[in-house]
Design a protein with these regions (language model features):
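Active-site-proximal segment of RNA-dependent polymerases
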Residues: 55-78, 123, 128-132, 171-224, ...
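Conserved pre-motif C helix in the palm subdomain of viral-like polymerases
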Residues: 108, 146-177, 195, 219-222, ...
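Surface-exposed loop/turn segments and immediately adjacent short secondary-structure elements
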Residues: 2-146, 152, 156-160, 376, ...
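Conserved polymerase palm-domain catalytic core
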Residues: 218-318, 326-333, 352-356
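Conserved catalytic palm subdomain of right-hand nucleotidyl-transferase polymerases, strongest
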Residues: 24, 87-95, 133, 143-153, ...
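Short, conserved micro-motifs composed of acidic
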Residues: 262, 348-373
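Basic, alpha-helical interaction scaffolds
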Residues: 369-439
């Protein structure tokens, strides 16, 4: 693993790849801020406002724990410690996970004692409730704070307890989540949903059915989770009080700071949201989103696509939700229900990023969102006609771009031919073949793929 990491770094150096540092950002009035102190102050204001708790929503917890969960075992701590990924940035305490893994049994004993103390008292060390937020740019204007997502760096020691807590929660979560939710679930991934949407479109075309899609985008979904509503949802879904109380106390009095290239802000309180970067966040958000869909009545709704006696009207991957129906009216009905229930728990639809796609005629379109003929669905291009040729062409172009970017590597006489071949197989072919499980490949596309592979080897060998 270490050699692979070193090779990756050397490739970046040879290619001259570098990540642009955050420059100026805009203040409330749209003026550029260039001074480090001003930028830090702006990030402090933005994140404090983003994670501010709603004052009208007090915590009504009665503090009664009815059933206690079994104590934490040393073998659980050992498993959790060994499963933490190495070479990851440390949290606020600055302690790398490699230190705990070097100490082995000594670290296991100490961490087991701390975890068991938390398990019995429900009180977390304050250091374990602190996060360092790293703003990561998304699409859009990089001078707007809202176009960044904040990734949380947390203490590696706390990850041991969080992994154990997640493992205890998982059995309940798996029981509650439906088959249409593939986000952060074992054995499921983005390619499953890509295949599902392609097969649904294929069946609709086979039986001459029109199909209408709405690709929903939430504004800051993970950051807007209301904690008190979350605890209520966990209780309704049968999560044991013991686990809920541990989660409640973990999220109580949480603190964070924002770290950028311009420095680190002061610590501030977090009153809502689940941190992107925390082990538990995907699991908790999936339950939060499931409550929205249940209250919207999607499972009982008649609207949707009927396949093999089953009605399918949505596909989900965490917060990314795709609604589908056989008519405009049905789709609008589904969307209104989801929008209403989402707003009840503090989530708002991002209308600017919401897309509508239809394989049939549009007569009286009354749904917010941009109407499109194609959509990038979890990295794969889906077109209204269900044709895969557009995606195959796009993948081949992306592969060519990667291959061209590696030219300086292929020209190097210091790198052996077998290593160059491995680089093509590891860095180029996976880009081209992403989502290929669901492709319908015609003869023309087959020839195109073969020609691309031949082009790669010729370029590698410098054959004109």
């Amino acid at each position: 693993m270490g050699k692979t990491r070193d090779l990756s770094e050397k490739i970046k150096d040879t290619k001259g790849t570098s990540h642009a540092k955050m420059g100026s950002i805009k203040d409330r009035n749209g003026m550029d801020l260039t001074e480090a102190e001003d930028i830090k102050k702006k990030w402090q204001e933005y994140t404090e406002e983003l994670y501010k708790k709603h004052l009208h929503n007090p915590d009504n917890h009665d503090g009664v724990i009815t059933d206690l969960e079994p104590d934490i075992l040393e073998c659980e701590v050992k498993w959790a410690l060994e499963s933490i990924t190495t070479n990851k940035a440390s949290g606020g305490d600055g302690i790398p996970v490699e230190l705990f893994q070097i100490l082995k049994d000594d670290a296991v004993k100490v961490l087991h004692s701390i975890c068991q103390q938390i398990w019995k008292t429900y009180q977390w060390p304050q250091d374990w409730k602190r996060s360092v937020f790293i703003p990561m740019p998304k699409k859009g204007n990089a001078k707007e704070c809202s176009n960044y997502c904040t990734i949380a760096l947390i203490s590696h020691a706390s990850k041991v307890m969080l992994k154990i807590l997640q493992a205890r929660l998982q059995q309940y979560v798996n029981h509650e989540l439906p088959y249409v939710q593939a986000g952060f679930r074992k054995g499921r991934g983005t390619r499953d949903q890509i295949a599902n949407i392609r097969w649904i479109m294929e069946k609709a075309r086979e039986f001459l059915k029109n199909i209408y899609f709405c690709f929903i985008d939430y504004a800051k979904a993970f950051d807007c989770v209301d904690h008190n509503k979350l605890w209520k949802i966990l209780k309704e879904m049968g999560i044991p009080d013991h686990l809920t109380c541990l989660l409640r106390n973990l999220y109580a009095s949480q603190e964070a700071t924002v770290r950028t290239g311009h420095g680190t802000t002061d610590w501030f309180q977090i009153g809502k949201g689940v941190c992107q970067g925390c082990i538990l966040s995907p699991c908790l958000f999936n339950l939060y989103a499931e409550d929205i869909m249940r209250n919207a009545g999607l499972e009982e709704a008649q609207a949707g696509i009927k396949i093999a006696g089953r009605n399918i009207n949505n596909l989900r991957y965490a917060d990314d939700t795709t609604l589908m129906a056989e008519s405009e009216e049905e789709l609008k009905s589904l969307l209104m229900k989801v929008k209403e229930e989402s707003e009840k728990v503090g989530l708002k639809l991002n209308i600017q990023k919401m897309k509508i796609m239809a394989s049939g005629p549009i007569t009286s379109w009354e749904i917010d969102g941009e109407t499109v003929s194609d959509f990038i669905f979890w990295g794969s291009k889906i077109t209204a006609d269900g044709d895969c040729s557009h995606e195959i062409k796009r993948r081949l172009l992306l592969g060519r771009k990667v291959m061209t970017n590696l030219d300086s590597i292929f020209k190097s006489r210091d790198i052996t031919l077998p290593t160059k071949v491995r680089l093509v197989k590891a860095m180029v072919f996976p880009v081209v073949m992403y989502g290929c499980e669901s492709w319908t490949v015609k003869k023309a596309e087959h020839r195109r793929i073969d020609a691309f592979e031949l082009w790669c080897w010729r370029r590698l060998l410098r054959v004109p």
